[in-house]
Amino acid sequence: MAKSNPNKQSVELNRTSLYWGLLLIFVLAVLFSSYIFN
């Protein structure tokens, strides 16, 4: 039981960092397109 807990936490952390990366790319794309079209 104690062995599967850190594994699950690592997967959850990886998924969270992936979502943050996608959010960061989305924000940068919006700022970049607004900079271009201005």
Curated annotation (Swiss-Prot):
Keywords for this protein: Chloroplast, Membrane, Photosynthesis, Photosystem II, Plastid, Reaction center, Thylakoid, Transmembrane, Transmembrane helix
Biological processes annotated in GO: photosynthesis
Xref: InterPro entries: PSII_PsbL, PSII_PsbL_sf
TM region(s), chain numbering: 17-37
Keyword hit for Chloroplast: yes
Coiled coil: none
Role this protein plays: One of the components of the core complex of photosystem II (PSII). PSII is a light-driven water:plastoquinone oxidoreductase that uses light energy to abstract electrons from H(2)O, generating O(2) and a proton gradient subsequently used for ATP formation. It consists of a core antenna complex that captures photons, and an electron transfer chain that converts photonic excitation into a charge separation. This subunit is found at the monomer-monomer interface and is required for correct PSII assembly and/or dimerization.
Protein name: Photosystem II reaction center protein L
